[in-house]
Amino acid sequence: MSDRRPDRGRHQARKRAVDLLFEAEARGLTAAEVATSRNKLAGTQPDVTALNPYTVTVARGVTDHRDHIDDLISAHLQGWTLDRLPAVDRAILRVAVWELLHAEDVPEPVAVDEAVELAKQLSTDDSPGFVNGVLGQVMLVTPQIRAASQAVRESAQGPSEG
């Protein structure tokens, strides 16, 4: 029987990213600021461990794309607004949507499965189904969003010489 989650390091990194987003929101900071602060502290305090590089990547990615991520989540909430969601659910959804849009090495089903698993571990009994439903809707539009982003990047680079 194969392990459903062969990369426990990534799972823990995602969980830590959710923790950082939750903490950042509570403190009125960005996730990138909290990650930077934590890693600086790890450099001076022997009892503080540096963050997994993937946690930092996710924190910075969510910070850089937060408005777009929140707009996309909000567009797929039915009967809810983003600010009415439990803070942990917002953090889980933000991590997962960032992965769906920007983590090219993470298959879409893995991003969704990981988010659902985090919702089971960290949130209410209703959250896993809710998170799965929202991300299922977001997954329907991610190919178009990724293609549009790629086209913008290519046009910004200008015509290739050849």
Swiss-Prot record:
GO terms for cellular component: cytosol. GO terms for biological process: DNA-templated transcription termination; transcription antitermination. CDD domains: Terminator_NusB. The keyword Transcription regulation applies. The keyword Transmembrane does not apply. Belongs to the NusB family. Coiled coil: none annotated. Pfam families: NusB. Involved in transcription antitermination. Required for transcription of ribosomal RNA (rRNA) genes. Binds specifically to the boxA antiterminator sequence of the ribosomal RNA (rrn) operons. HAMAP family: NusB (MF_00073). Keywords: RNA-binding, Transcription, Transcription antitermination, Transcription regulation. One of its GO terms (molecular function) is RNA binding. This is Transcription antitermination protein NusB.
